[in-house]
A protein has these predicted regions:
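Conserved beta-strand scaffold positions in the cores of enzyme catalytic domains, especially
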Residues: 35-37, 57, 87, 161-165
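S-adenosyl-L-methionine-dependent DNA methyltransferase catalytic core
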Residues: 1-34, 152-155, 179-203
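Glycine-rich, N-terminal phosphate-binding loop of Rossmann-like dinucleotide-binding domains
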Residues: 91
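N-terminal Rossmann-like NAD(P) cofactor-binding module of classical short-chain dehydrogenase/reductase
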Residues: 85-88, 130
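Class I S-adenosyl-L-methionine
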Residues: 73-81, 94, 98-203
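SAM cofactor-binding core of SAM-dependent methyltransferases
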Residues: 9-65
Length: 203
């Protein structure tokens, strides 16, 4: 059986938590490998690069056009012009927090970075994407933000786009940690919501 390896671009990578999850997720016929990552935090970049020395890390603000061009160039070089398969990332979410009603609106600059994530997807056109955020994103603009993002992704061709609220405790993490996910694929096969592997009530 030929094994397919999907190339991954990690945006707003932080020290590399999402990349670690993808790089260790394997099935008989497929695997994932992060090839390019981006964040504007120096400490995060150093940690990421130490743990992933073969991944090209672009340090800089993704809202800067020059940084976006560097990301696109690196992806092209790393994938041999084949393009990126999957884009993952968790845009900074301070403004989306359910505990901070004053910042939970699109007038807050902290909330604009999610649009740059969308812009990179539109430019690089991966086969699939995964966006992670805090649960508060579902309350943003009374749910209109998530509806808007899903609609924009569908306009790009990701008609198979959905959103979930998942609890890390349901998947073996020893703490209750709920997170929002928006996932999309160019493939028309319906995306199934992950089934819990553990009982969160035991935490």
């Amino acid at each position: 059986m030929v094994k397919k390896q999907f190339h991954v671009l990690d945006l707003f990578s932080g020290p590399g938590g999402l990349s670690l999850g993808f790089n260790t997720a394997k099935k008989a016929s497929l695997s994932f490998k992060s090839v390019v990552a981006n964040d504007n935090n120096l400490n995060a970049s150093q940690t990421f690069s130490k743990n992933n020395p073969d991944v090209e890390f672009i340090l800089g603000d993704i809202s800067d056009t020059k940084i976006k061009k560097k990301i696109a160039k690196s992806v092209k070089e790393k994938t041999g012009n084949q393009g990126i398969d999957v884009i993952i990332g968790g845009p900074p979410c301070k403004g989306f927090s359910l505990t901070n009603k004053m910042t939970r609106n699109m007038d807050n600059p902290m909330n604009h970075l999610v649009m740059h994530y969308l812009d990179v997807i539109k430019t690089l056109k991966p086969k699939a994407f995964v966006m992670e955020n805090v649960p508060g994103i579902f309350a943003m603009e009374k749910g209109k933000l998530v509806d808007y993002l899903i609609e924009e992704f569908k306009k790009m061709g990701y008609t198979n786009t959905t959103s979930w609220l998942l609890n890390a405790a349901d998947f073996g993490v020893p703490q209750i940690r709920k997170r929002a996910f928006i996932v999309g694929s160019l493939n028309k096969t319906p995306i199934e919501k992950p089934k819990p592997t553990h009982d969160s009530q035991s935490h």
